[in-house]
Amino acid sequence: PSLHWAGERIAPTICYEDLFTEELAARFANEAQAPTIFANLSNIAWFGDSVAIDQHLHISQMRALEFERPFLRATNTGATAIIDHRGNVVQQLPSAQRAVLTGEVTGHQQRTPYARWMAVTGLWPLAAWALVVLGLALWQHRRGKLRCATS
């Protein structure tokens, strides 16, 4: 469920929950209750100084773009940022420094076609399509082997 604050519906995510687009999309099933802002809280200290910190920021940028929602990120070691609804990092704190990030964020109400689609179907149609393509590829491969064997 979303948190209601200052006229916005803020959907909290913890750590890598923003990796799972279906989890976030489920929050858009009821348009009247759909979040207007995402907020991610993460303890990413155990990643150290690795690519995972930037990767997690990029995942949040992608989710902001997919759902056209601003994304607020608060972390303990790096990648604390404000991301706009287009996936652009508007503000970011330096990594591994204690600081406070402030800024203004306005939520968005409209659901993207992606959000509407994912809220209803999830990734199942894509998975089914991938299985059909894989099946056709295997069928073609076996058919080619049979031709070689009969030649």
Pin down the residues of each PLM region.
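Solvent-exposed soluble domains appended to multi-pass membrane proteins
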Residues: P1-S151
